[in-house]
């Protein structure tokens, strides 16, 4: 009886060691897969590649504060003069400027403020990109939160959340309008260059 009990204990211990060995092997395989997987995520890598090609001097979120400041000043200067070109300044520049600010600073608040400032006529003189740099450098928003009542902070956050949804809806409508306007002249939309509107 004692011999059988020892045998059972040895077999149980052996199975436990085997299971632990299998688990260790699985963990090693997972670690090797994670280490060897250098293509994740592919969209971000492609995005970085095209950004380097189109904007070779575009700083990243990990760039120095000086390079971000220079970039922000240039972006604000270009944004100020884009108001001279009505169609480009209203239809295309807000999306370009907002995207660049988001890629450099990576903040939802900066994204909303930039899109709002570039979209509303008459606000082009505001240096939004430079303000984003100052907020990142000196943490202005958290300092302001300390002196604002809680209800105002909640109101601002709710406004930002609602504005994000409105901005997405407006962008989709603008894209639809642009496609609808140019669709008669685009072959892949069933139109042609010789399209003539009949009244």
From Swiss-Prot:
Subcellular location: Membrane
Keyword Transmembrane (UniProt): yes
Listed Acidic residues bias regions: 23-35
Membrane-protein topology: Multi-pass membrane protein
This protein's GO CC annotations: membrane
Source species, domain of life: Eukaryota
Protein name: Putative uncharacterized transmembrane protein DDB_G0284801
Organism: Dictyostelium discoideum (Social amoeba)
